């Protein structure tokens, strides 16, 4: 029999922003993890009580700029983050972790339970946003980010694409300027700019009580091996009653993964619904199933 027990304490500290006379904004952040673990009959761990203290120190600097015109307000925000962690990192190369522009500047961006990203690295990024003055829900947004490190770190999850000296370049574009059509595109390109490891294209159309959204997702190389198209369509009969249809097509296997048809009733106190689900396969087992 094997036995594993762990006690983990995490401490985060973020300083107040310091803004100089030229508008340069800086802050210092710490993330400390204290791990106490005990293992029995694990080949890769010593069978006794272990403790380890790890920490990341980060200096983050940005230079936010704003420009206003008659109809729009434009934001430009270049960022740089210097991180240092001298402690040793546990081998997490086989863990599944996704890095994108929503988490690349998080100090614990890998979200690993019992270890922290080690070594020295620079995270570079830039954000641009064009927003309507009269309606801030209508905007065009572009984000780019990448990671540079002193040396390769093979303990970092390989599918995160940030374990090499020059990581992938991560980006996303969102266009919400139209009343009825919203578009978003997310991508991850290798450092040589000759291979797209991940891209996702989303399109949403809404008119009155009708809304439909299509997503195309493709993963290649170190990120994964996925090629799917999915759709979610909904219609609100009134403020309480709606009908929802969902489906996903796996283009890699040339199979439909599922169809969902959902009737939903919703008020201030209650959400109730009836769901018909037809699944064509689950994971590696090609076992069709129907559920109501």
Enumerate the predicted regions with their spans.
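Outer-membrane beta-barrel translocator/pore domains, especially the C-terminal barrels
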Residues: 1-292
